[in-house]
Structures are given as C-alpha cells and as structure tokens.
Amino acid sequence: QAGCSQSRAAFLTGLYPHQNGQIGLATWKYAMFSEKIPNVVKTLGKAGYRTGNIGKLHVNPEKAFPFDFKAIPSANFSRKGMSGYAENAKKFIKSSKRPFYLQINHPDAHRPFLKTVDGLPAKPLTGRDVDALPFMGINHPELRQQSADYYNCMMRLDSYIGDLLRVLAESGKAKNTVVVYIGDHGADVMRGKRTSYEGGVRIPMIIRWPGGKSGQDRKELVSTLDLFPTFCEIAGVKPPASLPGRSLRPLVAGEST
C-alpha cells in the first residue's frame, strides 16, 4: 500500500499489510496483529547483529522492533538538525564491534516540500524550470511549482545520502556493508502517494553490494517484501517460511531470471 506505516511494516516483516495487520497509519492507532510477528530487527538481532534506527519508525507496536540503538524518533517535518542523521550514523557505526543493521529514515521526501534547508540545494529549481511530474497528467503552473520543490527535496536528500556514504567510507567498513536505498511510497502529489497508480506504488530501489555486478538497471518486478529474505541470506540465517518475497542476491550478482 502506498502509505507510510503500511509500507514500512511490510518492509520490516516481509508481509503484505493484510498479513501483518498494519493497514493504516500508526498515527491513527493502526497496528500490526501481534508484536510476535517475525521481523528484520528481531531476526538479525538473534543472528548476532547490532541493530539501529535513526528517524521515525511509524509502525505499531514499536516494542515489536527491539533496536539496540535509536535516535531522532520524530518525523522532523520541519527539517531541524539535519546533520544529526549522519552524526548519529557515525556514532552507531563507530561503536559497533559486530555486524550491524542500520536503517535511516530521512524526512526530505515528505511534505512540506521545502525549497531550501541548510543552503541546500545550492541552486533550487522553480516552476519555470520543470514540467509537472509526468504521472500527474496536467502541466499546470501550480503543479510545476510543486514538482520543482519536490525535486529540490530530492537534490537535498541526495546530498544527505552522500554524507552517510562518507561516514561509512571513513569507518573502513564500506567494503563489507550492503547499502540499500528505497522509498516507502511515491511522491505525495496527485496520482502518487495513497493511490495504487504507478506514481504511488513505484519507488526507487538502489543496491550497492560489494562483490555484486555494478552498473545494472534490472527490469524485473521486485518489491520491498524481497528485502527481508535478502537480509537473511546476507546474515546466513533461514528466513521465516511465511515470507512471500525472495532474496535479491541473484539479481545483484547479475544472474538471469
């Protein structure tokens, strides 16, 4: 489902919303059927991984996810203290003496679409610079401005992701760490978030896997449900039998399907 909590619960449990129970926003008191449902955090924790979460979790009940490290638990829609995401990531990675799983939830893909934060992007776009996002279907000046500010958020987010990758590189652990970049749903614009149109359900999934085949642009249909079994394969543990997803390792390795 193209909603925050539903998508996050699906990613963390490897189950569809109707299977795990998180069919609405945690803000509105929707919750999973049970805190005992297997999830990424519990499974990797039992496998010896240190687990961490930076940014909002937005899934109920939160106690179902026993992270070893937590920071910046708010949604932070005002974008205050954005350097704190990379700073806390540095603290977590530096203090981790065993394999780790860290998820970082940046607010900058979310409304409000702020034109600039911390001087980023250096050259913000305006509605005169872009067309409206194609799936909107209407190229109105107001929608062009919305699209421009969404692009400004994405350019800024790109800078913040660069900060995180530098932190990882400086830790000396980059060559032994898989990095996955995803969104929880499409852009919060017309025919995007909250809908089942392509603009709502299609999201980025970029994987940097040391030893994998780089530079690929795969066309297979995959989903965030495939990440839990992928992480299980990385950790060398058996995934729960109930998971509908499959490990993405063969695709990352360049194998045909």
Place the predicted regions along the sequence by residue.
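Formylglycine-dependent sulfatase
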Residues: Q1-T257
